[in-house]
């Protein structure tokens, strides 16, 4: 009987640790384009856990790219970029922005979590944001159109 109780307690602790550990930070997206996975850096976020909540304000997306030394994934003009999360964001909350050289941003239209990259050659920095029941989060990535 004692062994059963210890085993049950160990299972509860393990499951609880996995559950709470996986909910401490926002989910990270998987971004793919032309069979390549794009490296993504965490941007600003606010997230609520069971015990605490935190908001973290990050530097600008171009500075995040420099800080994390992210290299652009080289893609074809007008390639389709797919954004997926292991935990689905709230409906109609996924947004993308293209960062311009003057520090301004413009909306990057998404259709079913797919973004079409520009046809002009160049390096493009994008930020993506979404909301969940536990909070909101932003992410940054860079691509190069050849």
Pin down the residues of each PLM region.
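Surface-exposed, short loops/turns at beta-strand junctions within beta-sandwich domains
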Residues: 115-125, 133
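Edge beta-strands of extracellular beta-sandwich domains
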Residues: 29, 136-146
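Mature extracytoplasmic domains of secretory-pathway proteins
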Residues: 47-104
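N-terminal export/targeting and maturation segments
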Residues: 15-57
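Surface-exposed coil/turn segments at beta-strand junctions on protein surfaces, enriched
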Residues: 74-76, 110, 119-121
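Short beta-strand segments within Ig-like beta-sandwich modules, predominantly Fibronectin type-III
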Residues: 104-111
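Hydrophobic membrane-insertion alpha-helices, especially the h-region
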Residues: 5-19
């Amino acid at each position: 009987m004692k062994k059963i109780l210890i085993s049950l307690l160990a299972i509860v602790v393990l499951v609880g640790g996995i559950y709470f550990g996986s909910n401490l930070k926002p989910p990270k997206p998987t971004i793919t384009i032309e069979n390549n996975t794009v490296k993504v850096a965490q941007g600003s976020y606010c997230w609520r856990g069971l015990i605490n909540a935190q908001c973290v304000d990050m530097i600008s997306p171009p500075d995040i790219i420099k800080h994390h030394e992210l290299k652009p994934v080289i893609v074809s003009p007008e390639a389709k970029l797919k954004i997926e999360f292991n935990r689905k964001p709230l409906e109609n909350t996924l947004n993308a922005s293209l960062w311009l050289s003057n520090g301004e941003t413009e909306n990057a239209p998404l259709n079913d979590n797919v973004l079409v990259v520009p046809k002009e050659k160049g390096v493009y920095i994008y930020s993506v944001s979404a909301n969940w029941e536990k909070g909101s989060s932003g992410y940054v990535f860079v691509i190069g159109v050849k």
